């Protein structure tokens, strides 16, 4: 088995830097589009055989060191009682705005309400047969609450920010419920066979460090502390968190995901030797000529300076119009340039 990814999560030495890409199963791959053309996005997420097929594609095509479950962060929110659609982009018909709205939300039973996610994990563990580890994932409570309150995507998330200050009791009740749901969902993924968990806090960085510490940190910390993760590393990725790494670190977890706005070496200096890191190439670099991609890969590796506990990744998801051969080249460069 290729254990480089898991070893790096635990800060152990590896023979070369492991690499995978956020959104590595996605629209930039013709093979993904061939599957996606036959069904809607939600149907793809809810059909274990198809979700497993697209999860495996980048392992075979790119040669990455980990597979990540194909799903969506909002999958477990729908059975809380919110109708979800993609038109495109996620839309909830009835956003959560009042205490009555929060009280109507239920905590789903993952085995009963999202069995397709757990079945996908079981299929993947069998299909991967130890080739590379399988990462499960979920959205952080704050990012999930952003969509639930706004009802759709937003540039500034003003509605949930207003709730924090104007209706703090509603915000706290919602975050408590979402955190409980998240904990049940991620623990079910671990029971089903996920070998690592990534928590995506895509919108955590829209808050000031003070607001993050007050309104977000307690819930993410509670979530991470509530995971049954003796042998399952947890990666915590907060996009835009470069100005508050030490605060985000207080949430716990084993690996800090970094976006491209921070120098990886300086981030490691701040976080200390006991926190592994993942990142952090700007996704747009994959539009560059191959020799430029190689230079940029080397720069990120040089910033890490050979320290154990580095997983190479993009600073956010791969973009849908990136040429697949450039992603393949990036993976090859990481492996070749980091070979011990």
From Swiss-Prot:
Subcellular localization: Cytoplasm
GO molecular function, one term: uroporphyrinogen decarboxylase activity
Cytoplasm found in the keyword field: yes
Positions with a binding annotation for substrate: 23-27, 72, 147, 202, 316
Involved pathway(s): Porphyrin-containing compound metabolism; protoporphyrin-IX biosynthesis; coproporphyrinogen-III from 5-aminolevulinate: step 4/4
InterPro entries xref list: UROD/MetE-like_sf (IPR038071), Uroporphyrinogen_deCO2ase_HemE (IPR006361), Uroporphyrinogen_deCOase (IPR000257)
Chief place where the protein resides: cytoplasm
Record's catalysed reaction(s): uroporphyrinogen III + 4 H(+) = coproporphyrinogen III + 4 CO2
Gene Ontology CC annotation, any one: cytosol
Key words, A-Z: Cytoplasm, Decarboxylase, Lyase, Porphyrin biosynthesis
Enzyme class label: lyase
Site residues, Transition state stabilizer: 72
Highest rank taxon of the organism: Bacteria
Documented EC number(s): 4.1.1.37
Keyword Cytoplasm recorded: yes
GO biological process: protoporphyrinogen IX biosynthetic process from glutamate
Stretches assigned to coiled coil: none
PANTHER family referenced in this protein's UniProt entry, alphabetically: METHYLTETRAHYDROFOLATE:HOMOCYSTEINE METHYLTRANSFERASE RELATED (PTHR21091), UROPORPHYRINOGEN DECARBOXYLASE (PTHR21091:SF169)
Protein function: Catalyzes the decarboxylation of four acetate groups of uroporphyrinogen-III to yield coproporphyrinogen-III.
Assembly description: Homodimer.
Family label: Belongs to the uroporphyrinogen decarboxylase family.
HAMAP family: URO_D
Protein name: Uroporphyrinogen decarboxylase
Organism: Geobacter metallireducens (strain ATCC 53774 / DSM 7210 / GS-15)
């Amino acid at each position: 088995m290729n254990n480089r990814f898991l070893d790096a999560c635990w800060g152990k030495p590896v023979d070369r830097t492991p690499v995978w890409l956020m959104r590595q199963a996605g629209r930039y791959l013709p093979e993904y589009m061939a599957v996606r053309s036959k069904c809607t996005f939600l149907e793809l997420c809810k059909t274990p055989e198809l979700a497993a097929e697209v999860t495996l594609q980048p392992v075979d095509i790119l040669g990455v060191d980990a597979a990540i479950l194909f799903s969506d962060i909002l999958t477990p929110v729908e059975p809380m009682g919110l109708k979800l659609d993609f038109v495109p982009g996620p839309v909830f018909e009835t956003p959560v705005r009042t205490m009555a709205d929060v009280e109507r939300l239920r905590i789903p039973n993952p085995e009963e309400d999202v069995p397709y996610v757990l079945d996908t994990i079981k299929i993947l563990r069998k299909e991967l047969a130890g080739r590379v580890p399988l990462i499960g994932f979920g959205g952080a409570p704050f990012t999930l609450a952003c969509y639930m309150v706004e009802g759709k995507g937003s540039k500034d998330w003003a509605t949930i920010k207003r709730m924090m200050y104007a209706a703090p009791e509603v915000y706290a009740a919602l975050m408590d419920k979402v955190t409980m749901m998240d904990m049940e969902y991620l623990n079910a993924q671990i029971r089903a066979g996920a070998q690592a968990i990534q928590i995506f806090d895509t919108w955590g960085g829209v808050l000031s460090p003070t607001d993050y510490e007050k309104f977000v940190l307690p819930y993410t910390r509670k979530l991470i502390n509530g995971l049954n993760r003796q042998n399952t590393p947890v990666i915590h990725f907060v996009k835009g968190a470069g100005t508050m790494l030490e605060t985000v670190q207080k949430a716990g977890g084993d690996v800090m995901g970094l976006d491209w706005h921070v120098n990886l070496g300086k981030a490691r200096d701040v976080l200390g030797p006991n926190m592994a890191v993942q990142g952090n190439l700007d996704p747009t670099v994959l539009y560059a000529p191959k020799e430029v991609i190689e230079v940029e890969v080397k720069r990120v590796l040089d910033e890490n300076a050979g320290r154990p506990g580095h997983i190479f990744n993009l600073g956010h998801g791969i973009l849908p119009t990136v040429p697949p051969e450039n992603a393949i080249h990036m993976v090859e460069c990481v492996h070749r340039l980091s070979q011990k």
